[in-house]
Design a protein with these regions (language model features):
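Buried hydrophobic positions in well-ordered alpha/beta secondary-structure cores of metabolic enzymes
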Residues: 9, 20, 52, 59, ...
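Conserved "HGTGT" condensation-loop signature of ketosynthase/thiolase-family condensing enzymes
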Residues: 14
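Gly-rich Lys/Arg/Thr-decorated short loops/hinges at beta-loop-alpha junctions or inter-strand turns
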Residues: 25
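C-terminal helix-coil-helix/basic helical segment that borders enzyme active sites and/or dimer interfaces
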Residues: 28-36
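Active-site-flanking structural segment that lines cofactor/substrate pockets
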Residues: 39-53
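Glycine-rich, Trp-frequent "lid" loop and neighboring beta-strands that shape
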Residues: 64-65, 105-163
């Protein structure tokens, strides 16, 4: 039994790696960190969106590629081979999975299409579910969330949050 990546998965992963090598050199990342490269960061993000990173797991009916978690793992490894100043795990893996498995039909239609079109990016707040931190706490009353979470995956780029 073969446990490696398929040809398609390896090809996708290699494209991500090559893109980062070409577009996100250490000098570019230093400029972004120094606050001189907001446009550069947006260009890198858009380039990776053009490769389909935002719609890997989303079903085709919602504008996605309908690939599997192994593709997402291969892409994650490709992103990890360089420096990728973009949201990925929260916005493009965890959020689509949560919506696909926990959302109603209207939520799936609304949010999965918007993720595929790069109109929304999700942050994921899980730590309060596991254990509250000192000086933090999130309370949900009815349809309102109030409080402070100390950690949210992809929170700095989020337009929406899943708690």
């Amino acid at each position: 039994m073969y446990f490696g990546l398929s040809e398609e998965q390896a090809f996708f992963q290699d494209n991500v790696k090559k893109f980062l090598e070409d577009q996100a050199s250490l000098d570019v990342i230093r400029r972004i960190v120094a606050g001189e490269g907001d446009d550069l960061q947006k260009e890198i993000h858009q380039g990776l969106i053009n490769l389909g990173l935002n719609s890997l797991l989303i079903p085709e009916e919602y504008g996605g590629l309908e690939l599997d978690l192994l593709f997402a793992a291969a892409v994650s490894e490709g992103l990890g081979s360089g420096i990728a100043p973009i949201p990925f795990i929260g916005s493009y893996v965890m959020a689509p999975l949560a919506i696909m498995h926990g959302g109603n039909d209207a939520q799936k239609e609304h949010y999965l299409n918007k993720i595929s079109a790069n109109q929304v990016r999700f942050g994921i707040g899980l730590t309060e579910y596991i254990a509250a931190r000192e000086d933090a706490g999130v309370e949900i009353t009815g349809n309102k969330v109030n409080g402070r979470a100390l950690f949210a995956i992809d929170g700095d780029n989020a337009t929406h949050f899943i708690l």
